[in-house]
A protein has these predicted regions:
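Residues in the short beta-alpha loop(s) of Rossmann-like NAD(P)-binding domains
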Residues: 1-2, 67, 90, 143
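Short glycine-rich anion-binding loops that position phosphate/pyrophosphate groups of nucleotides
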Residues: 44-45, 67-68, 145-146
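Glycine- and other small-residue-rich loops at beta-strand/loop junctions that grip anionic moieties
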Residues: 18, 36-41, 64-66, 86-87, ...
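C-terminal hydrophobic helical "lid"/dimerization subdomain
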Residues: 49, 91, 96-149
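Short glycine-centered segments of the SAM/dcSAM-binding site in methyltransferase folds
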Residues: 59-60, 83
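Helix-to-beta-strand junctions that scaffold the AdoMet/dcAdoMet cofactor pocket
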Residues: 55-57
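Adenosine-nucleotide cofactor-binding segment
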Residues: 1-50
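Rossmann-fold NAD(P)-binding glycine/threonine-rich loop
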Residues: 65-82, 92-99
Length: 149
């Protein structure tokens, strides 16, 4: 997690943005009480474990990252009556967010730290995200000429 991403989370309204490398993330998330809902967006086993451990009984975990195989304690899920939901961001999954964007009440332009044409997506897009942790989101534009129109 980069300082830029943590700061941006606060700018977008997160009440807390934590760096998982700074100690017991689950305990820090539970300060003031366990969570009703957690979103796992980092794509690591450690962040998944922290998100699950931060939930109250009956809480919900939404997985929005892609991470391949993970370990889950099925007994814990059942015993604590947790709900697990996977989401890949289809248009009708976020109607409130889309309305905020359409009305101009939410500007996500600050999250886009780089824009690259499609033919440079790997070298200047994905590899930049891996090398430069200050990058937040890279926009891959299949037709840059339309962006200038």
């Amino acid at each position: 997690v980069s300082p830029e991403r943590l700061a941006l989370a606060g700018e977008f309204g997160a009440s807390r943005a934590l760096d998982a490398r700074d100690g017991d993330t689950a305990a820090r998330l539970r300060e003031g009480g366990a969570l009703d809902c957690a979103f796992e967006a980092a794509g690591s086993q450690a962040s998944l474990d922290a998100a699950l451990a931060s939930l109250r009984k009956g809480g919900e975990l939404v997985l929005v990252s892609l991470m391949g195989e993970v370990r889950l304690d099925a007994f814990d899920l059942v015993n604590r009556e947790l709900r697990l939901l996977g989401s890949v961001g289809y248009r009708d999954a976020y109607p409130e967010l889309i309305a905020l964007l359409a009305d101009g009440r939410l500007d996500l332009a600050r999250a886009v730290t780089r824009s690259v044409p499609l033919e440079q997506a790997v070298e200047h897009g994905f590899e930049a995200l891996l090398r430069d942790k200050s990058q937040v989101k890279v926009l891959v534009n299949p037709n840059p000429a339309l962006a200038d129109a």
